[in-house]
C-alpha cells in the first residue's frame, strides 16, 4: 500500500493472526468430499461441471493455506480463472455460491458484468469488484485476498463489432465493448490491483491495494449463439457477404457447447471477445441443459421443500400431486429456462394461497393441495 497522503484516511490494518485463524478454521475436504457436500446442500445434475468445480475449490483452499498457514508464496502458474458456460437455469452461479459461500465460507462476490464500464464512463469501474470483495471480507484486505469473484452475465460483454447475435434475444447489444474487456484482461493477470475502498463515492480514503495471487475469478454466461458460431467455423463458413446470418440457424436457447468447441478461440473472437481475455481463463467448463429427471429432483428436493417449510410455519401442509410435478417440469423444459422455470411456474399459484391464508393465526391447520385439471394447476385449501 502506498504511504498515506495528506488529507486521506488510511485503511484499517487487521492483524495477520485474524486471517490465519480464519483460514485454519476452514475444513479441509477432498474434491470428492466437496462434491458430496454439494449433494447434501441440494445441488443436482451437472456431474462433469461439479467435478471440475470441486477441484477448483480444493485448489483455492490449498493456495490460501499454503500462503497463510505454511508461510510459502503461491506457486507460479497456480492461479485459477474459470469460465462457466451454459444455458440459463443450469446451476452456474448456484454452484459458485454453494462451493465458496457455504462449503469453504471465504469472501465471495457475485457481480453483474453488465454494470461494468470503461474507466471514465458512467457505470462501475472493473476494479470495484475488489471493493465489494473488501466489504464482504469485513474490510480486511488480506482476508479479501483469499476470496472469490464471480462475474455473472459475462457473455453480455461481447462487443457489437462482430457478427455475434445473442440467440433468443435477437440483439447485438454492446454494453461496454473492448474497453471493459481490456480492463478485465489486466485484472485477471495482475499480481495485485488498486481498488477504491468507498467505491469511488468520495476521495477521503487513499486507494487500497489487494494481492490477487490467491483470488479466484469465475465468469459465468449463457453464451447463446456460441455453439452455432463454432459449428459455422467447423463447416468452414466465412465472414462477410454470402455468409448465412447467425440468427437464421434458430439455435435453441438451452444448448450444450462441447469441449472441442470450447477450444475454438476463433469462435469466441467472432462472438465478440478479445482472444487474450478468453486465454486468461485456464479452465472452461460447459454446463448442459438440465433434463427432466434432474429438474424433477430439483423441484422435489429444493423448490417444493422450501415452500413446504414456509407454508408449515403458517399452519398449512403443502401437498402436490405427481401430475402437477410433471406439468411444472414440462413447462420448464418448454421454456428452456432450467431450474428457474420451476419456481416461475409455481410462484403465482402459491402466492394466491399465501395472500389468503398467511398471517391468520386463528385458523386451524389445513392442507393446500395442488392438482392438475384440464391441463391447468389448481390450488385448493381444505
Identify the meaning behind each predicted range.
Residues 2-45, 50-109, 114-135, 139-382:
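AAA+ P-loop NTPase nucleotide-binding core of proteostasis motors
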Amino acid at each position: 500500500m502506498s504511504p498515506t497522503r495528506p488529507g486521506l484516511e488510511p485503511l484499517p490494518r487487521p492483524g495477520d493472526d485474524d486471517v490465519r485463524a480464519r483460514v485454519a478454521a476452514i475444513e479441509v475436504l477432498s474434491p470428492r468430499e466437496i462434491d458430496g457436500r454439494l449433494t447434501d446442500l441440494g445441488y443436482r445434475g451437472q456431474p462433469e461441471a461439479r467435478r471440475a468445480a470441486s477441484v477448483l475449490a480444493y485448489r483455492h483452499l490449498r493456495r490460501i493455506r499454503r500462503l497463510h498457514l505454511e508461510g510459502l508464496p503461491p506457486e507460479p502458474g497456480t492461479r485459477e480463472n474459470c469460465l462457466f458456460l451454459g444455458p440459463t437455469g443450469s446451476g452456474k452461479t448456484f454452484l459458485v455460491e454453494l462451493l465458496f459461500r457455504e462449503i469453504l465460507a471465504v469472501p465471495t462476490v457475485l457481480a453483474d458484468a453488465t454494470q461494468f464500464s470503461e474507466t471514465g464512463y458512467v457505470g462501475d469501474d472493473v476494479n470495484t469488484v475488489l471493493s465489494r470483495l473488501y466489504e464482504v471480507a469485513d474490510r480486511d484486505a488480506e482476508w479479501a485476498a483469499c476470496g472469490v469473484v464471480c462475474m455473472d452475465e459475462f457473455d453480455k460483454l461481447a462487443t457489437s463489432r462482430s457478427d455475434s447475435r445473442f440467440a433468443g434475444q435477437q440483439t447485438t447489444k454492446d454494453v461496454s465493448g473492448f474497453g471493459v474487456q481490456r480492463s478485465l484482461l489486466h485484472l485477471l493477470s495482475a499480481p495485485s490491483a488498486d481498488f477504491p475502498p468507498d467505491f469511488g463515492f468520495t476521495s477521503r480514503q487513499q486507494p487500497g491495494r489487494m494481492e490477487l495471487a490467491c483470488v479466484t475469478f469465475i465468469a459465468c454466461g449463457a453464451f447463446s449463439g456460441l455453439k452455432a458460431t463454432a459449428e459455422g467455423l467447423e463447416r468452414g463458413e466465412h465472414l462477410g457477404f454470402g455468409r448465412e446470418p447467425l440468427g437464421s440457424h434458430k439455435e435453441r436457447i438451452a444448448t450444450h457447447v462441447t469441449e472441442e468447441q470450447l477450444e475454438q478461440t476463433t469462435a469466441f473472437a467472432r462472438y465478440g471477445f478479445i482472444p487474450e481475455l478468453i486465454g486468461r481463463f485456464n479452465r472452461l467448463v460447459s454446463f448442459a441443459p438440465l433434463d427432466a429427471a434432474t429438474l424433477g429432483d430439483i423441484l422435489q428436493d429444493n423448490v417444493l421443500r422450501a415452500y413446504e417449510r414456509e407454508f408449515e410455519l403458517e399452519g398449512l401442509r403443502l401437498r402436490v400431486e405427481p401430475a402437477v410435478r410433471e406439468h411444472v417440469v414440462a413447462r420448464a423444459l418448454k421454456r428452456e429456462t432450467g431450474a428457474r422455470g420451476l419456481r416461475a411456474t409455481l410462484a403465482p399459484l402459491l402466492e394466491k394461497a399465501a395472500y389468503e391464508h398467511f398471517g391468520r393465526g386463528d385458523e386451524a391447520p389445513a392442507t393446500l393441495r395442488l392438482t392438475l385439471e384440464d391441463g391447468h394447476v389448481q390450488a385448493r385449501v381444505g
